[in-house]
Each structure stands twice: as C-alpha cells, then as structure tokens.
C-alpha cells in the first residue's frame, strides 16, 4: 500500500508544482519522502520546490540528501550552487558549480542563473530598506 501511496503523493506533488501551487507540492513531496526516504527524485523535486519559494536552506538540505543517494545529478549540484550563492556561501557555491560543469552542466548558463539570483537578492535588500524607512517615517 505505501508503495502506491508514495508514488501518488509524488505525482500529486509534481502536478501541484506545475500548477504553481508550490507550497502544496512541498507537502506532497515531504509525505512521499517519509514513505520512500531513499528516492533521490523525490528529494530533488522537494529541493526545487523549496528553492522556488526562496527557502534556500531547506532546498540545500533536500538537494544534499538527494545527492547522498545519487551523486550523478548535475542539476542537483547546479541548483544547490544557486542556493549557496543566495545565502552567501560562495565557496560552496563555486565547488558545486565546478562539480555540475564537470558532469555536463553549461557553465555560462549556470553562472548567469547565479548572477540573476544575486541581483534579485540585492533588489530584495533595497526594497526591505525602503520599507523600513517608510515605516519609520509613518
């Protein structure tokens, strides 16, 4: 029964993610992972979902657990590199970039993705400062 249930949860998680219901997909991927903790595909998709909503620390944990099961997933290294960059773990990010590229990821594309994430982070910091300034003025 749990064999079929984990797959049902996983597939519902995928469909939820495709529909833009990322928080819902996280729930389903977590339920699926509890039933099938040794499945790297579940953990990878959990990482992608966390990354999508900006929960980079949780995403890193999921990608790391996925890579413990299957260390040949260049996408997991690439996504984890992006997450590490976002939380200013640049040494770890660079290490994962090198590993992803060694496994076939396109270096220019990955570096561009990291650059975009860093730009987004800077914009968020600026916006946060503006909001705080406005709150203090009111």
Report each predicted region and the residues it spans.
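Register position in tetratricopeptide repeats
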Residues: 18-19, 52-53, 86-87, 116-123
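Terminal, low-structured helical/coil segments at or just beyond the last alpha-helical repeat
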Residues: 6, 94-138
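Helix-start (N-cap) detector for alpha-helical repeat units in TPR-like alpha-solenoids
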Residues: 6-7, 40-41, 74-75, 107-109
């Amino acid at each position: 029964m749990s064999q079929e249930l984990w797959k049902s949860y996983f597939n519902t998680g995928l469909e939820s993610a495709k529909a833009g219901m990322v928080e819902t997909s996280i729930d389903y991927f977590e339920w699926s992972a509890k039933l099938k903790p040794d499945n790297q595909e579940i953990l990878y998709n959990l990482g992608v979902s966390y990354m999508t909503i900006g929960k980079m620390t949780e995403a890193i944990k999921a990608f790391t657990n996925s890579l413990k099961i299957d260390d040949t997933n260049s996408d997991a290294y690439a996504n984890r590199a992006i997450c590490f960059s976002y939380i200013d773990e640049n040494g770890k990010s660079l290490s994962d970039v090198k590993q992803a590229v060694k496994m076939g990821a396109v270096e220019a594309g990955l570096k561009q993705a990291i650059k975009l994430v860093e730009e987004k982070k800077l914009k968020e910091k600026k916006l946060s400062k503006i909001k705080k300034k406005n709150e203090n003025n009111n």
